[in-house]
Amino acid sequence: MGQDTRSLVLVVLVGLVGAVSADVQVMKDVTLGFGQALEQCREESQLTEEKMEEFFHFWREDFKFEHRELGCALQCMSRHFNLLTDSSRMHHENTDKFIKSFPNGAVLSKTMVELIHNCELQHDAEEDHCWRILRVAECFKISCTKAGIAPSMEVMMAEFIMELKQ
């Protein structure tokens, strides 16, 4: 491989790492922004303090999607930001705008809306909105991890700590 080819490969790799890093940053910002509605939704969704704390570990590999009230909280949080239709399905346009409201959100908005939509299609038969939304969230997390856009728990915890100090 010639020097020019190696230089080109290096530039492409650095660009890809930068793009992935930017996507993860956007995902972190969207996660934190979305999470701002959690406290307001805690009572409505009958979420205990313990289960509410579980939300801070959403991006951990071993996070469990097994409590209906987590799905109810996600539904409430989505409604808080007007991200759901009357049938508790994703409102594509509003979700796109919500994601784009974050710095560099336009980089990831189309991908995120597509991932959520594909997950909704997989779980559309579930009649209970809370359970369906919980399954969609699980599918979304798996899809984000596979796509390399899921933020690490280390990054999320550092951000949570920084926000608590403010």
UniProtKB/Swiss-Prot annotation:
It holds the Pfam family PBP_GOBP. The keyword Cell wall biogenesis/degradation does not apply. Olfactory tissue; expressed by the glia-like support cells that ensheathe the sensory neurons and line the base of the sensillum lumen. Residues 1-22 form the signal peptide. Keywords: Disulfide bond, Olfaction, Sensory transduction, Signal, Transport. It comes from the Eukaryota. GO terms for biological process: sensory perception of smell. Disulfide bonds join 41-76, 72-130, 119-139. One of its GO terms (molecular function) is odorant binding. Belongs to the PBP/GOBP family. Present in the aqueous fluid surrounding olfactory sensory dendrites and are thought to aid in the capture and transport of hydrophobic odorants into and through this fluid. Homodimer. This is General odorant-binding protein 1. The lineage of its organism: Eukaryota, Metazoa, Ecdysozoa, Arthropoda, Hexapoda. The gene is GOBP1.
